[in-house]
Amino acid sequence: FYDRKEIKDVIAYLRLVYQPNDRMSFSRIVNVPTRGIGATSLEKFLIWQASSGMDIIAALNNVEQTSTITARARTALANLGTILRNIQGMVQAGKTPAEIIDSLITATGYRDYLLDGTPQAEERDANIGALLSEVQVFADLAEFLEEVALVSSADTNAGKEKVTLMTIHAAKGLEFPVVFMVGMEEGIFPSSRVYEAGPQE
């Protein structure tokens, strides 16, 4: 499911919002949907962004400060910056991943971009609908992106013999044939406060 192009596109947007210096995600979404930003303008923007000390989203919102990029590309980059800044605001306001994705695909015109009249268009749109349903169980964006990273990692390593090192919180809900819990020291983990609270009803 997470290997489908449309799902990867949406997740790249979310990763960039969550980690504004994620160049790989930015490179994936900068022209999705098409914004008319050429390779030369993109390269000049990234050089300027790196020298400015700003993260990618901040640089997009201050792109008028550079004259090395064409006016048309600056406008397109600034518009993208406004969308991403607004989505960042939703994350900071504690909106759910479903609300964030819904706003994102509306603001970017991504759904219209998917419905391009090809035979695959409806299937792609249905996949976005399935993603919106799937994220309902996540309270915040960080939790969802962590789950995506775990699923992607599991898919990559499927069938390989390996040891997976993770926190107890990251392991919640997962199943393994053998589990070793290290650092279990009474009073530290579980916390001594567990015993002070008394039995749960």
For each feature predicted by the language model, list its residue ranges:
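Conserved phosphate-binding/catalytic loops in two-lobed NTP-binding clefts
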Residues: 1
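Conserved helicase C-terminal RecA-like lobe
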Residues: 4, 11-201
